[in-house]
Amino acid sequence: MSLLNVPAGKELPEDIYVVIEIPANADPIKYEVDKESGALFVDRFMSTAMFYPCNYGYINHTLSLDGDPVDVLVPTPYPLQPGAVIRCRPVGVLKMTDESGEDAKLVAVPHTKLSKEYDHIKDVNDLPELLKAQITHFFEHYKDLEKGKWVKVDGWDNAEAAKAEIVASFERAAKK
């Protein structure tokens, strides 16, 4: 089955499917699923020797303000394979701006059917402070050595803001 056929979720915006592009703690390689073929491409080798602190992916059939599907960070006990689809629930959003404009990153935890480990996390403020600091630090610096690129982290927002972003981006994609 092509990744293009993966639905956005079971019950938006509370129950979503995230297509993983980059595993947690992986080498500094940015992968992206091509939105036309469904194939996993190497987007670039990151100049900064850093690794993603969480699994990184997107929600299919959504369109964020940067013109791409909504980005999602998924903390898990083990790194996930690129191309894997994981059922999640959103708990927050990291608000960011980069050289292309707004670039929010949702944070979602594995659905309770996959792991009870995250049941107590209802909102971004329930995440470990160290994890939030690692995520913030990563996104503040991962483009530091790329000429003409920059990132400004604008702060964290709650689960309701994440759900609102999912609904808005799903509606945006449906209109396109």
Curated annotation (Swiss-Prot):
GO terms for biological process: phosphate-containing compound metabolic process. Its EC number is 3.6.1.1. InterPro entries: Pyrophosphatase (IPR008162), Pyrophosphatase_sf (IPR036649). SUPFAM superfamilies: Inorganic pyrophosphatase. PROSITE patterns: PPASE. Substrate binds at K30, R44, Y56, Y142. Pfam families: Pyrophosphatase. Mg(2+) 1 binds at D66, D71, D103. Gene3D superfamilies: Inorganic pyrophosphatase (3.90.80.10). One of its GO terms (cellular component) is cytosol. Mg(2+) 2 binds at D71. GO terms for molecular function: inorganic diphosphate phosphatase activity; magnesium ion binding. Its cofactor is Mg(2+). It is found in: Cytoplasm. It catalyses: diphosphate + H2O = 2 phosphate + H(+). Belongs to the PPase family. NCBIfam families: PRK01250.1 (NF002317). Catalyzes the hydrolysis of inorganic pyrophosphate (PPi) forming two phosphate ions. This is Inorganic pyrophosphatase.
